[in-house]
Amino acid sequence: GSTVAFIEAIARAAGWKVGAYTSPHLLRYNEPVRLDGVEADDASLVAAFEAVDAARAATPLTYFEFGTWAALWLFERVGLELAVLEVGLGGRLDAVNLVDPDVAVITTVDVDHTDWLGADREAIGAEKAGIARAWKPLVLGEVDSPSSVLRHAYATGANALRLGSDFFHEPLDGGHWRWREVGAELVLPMPVLSAPAQRANAASAIVALRALPGDAIPDEAFAQG
């Protein structure tokens, strides 16, 4: 949720054409698919569903697979500069993990969906770490990531960037906070939701964007986003 929103807002403030995909929806199915900040309309979604249905032929798809392929179909036709994809459940076997990301982010590892992901943080962390890719950045947004996440990152060859080791955040007076890493820092307006967890998510979003290949995002876009 919020990490995707931070990445999307900052990239759009930098002038990038951005698509975002989250799940599940709260009120309307249109919510999970955003094209340049605007929810996909009904006609676009219907066209995407029809395209996926035709392409799958006799191959069965789950609800989330169908929705993910539809979002990717729309993104490909719009011609984006950045696609931000949120994993729906776990990571290793999630439909979104079909895509090879330039940067992956794991914010926190909580004990939920235990019937599917495992009984504790170590087991769940191993599932979430499945989104890591060799030689690509893996941003870890909590200080005490499970050892299973770190083991998988190292075994995969991913470049783990860890909160509390590689980047930091701290509150400041006057409604601001500081993000920093070795050799760089930003002083930014406090997020609307100013809890430490939200600052950690915002800090992770900054690291993810700075780790992307290509043109750097200007500092002012981080403040505007």
Residues covered by each model-derived region:
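Short alpha-helix boundary/capping motifs
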Residues: 1, 65, 142-144
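Hydrophobic positions on the alpha1 helix immediately C-terminal to the Walker A/P-loop
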Residues: 2-7
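Short, well-ordered alpha-helices that flank and scaffold nucleotide-derived cofactor binding pockets
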Residues: 8-13, 73, 77, 151, ...
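A short glycine/serine-rich beta->alpha loop
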Residues: 56-61, 190-196
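Acidic, Mg2+-coordinating active-site environments of NTP-dependent enzymes
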Residues: 81-86, 101-192, 200-223
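A generic local secondary-structure boundary/capping motif
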Residues: 93-96, 128, 196
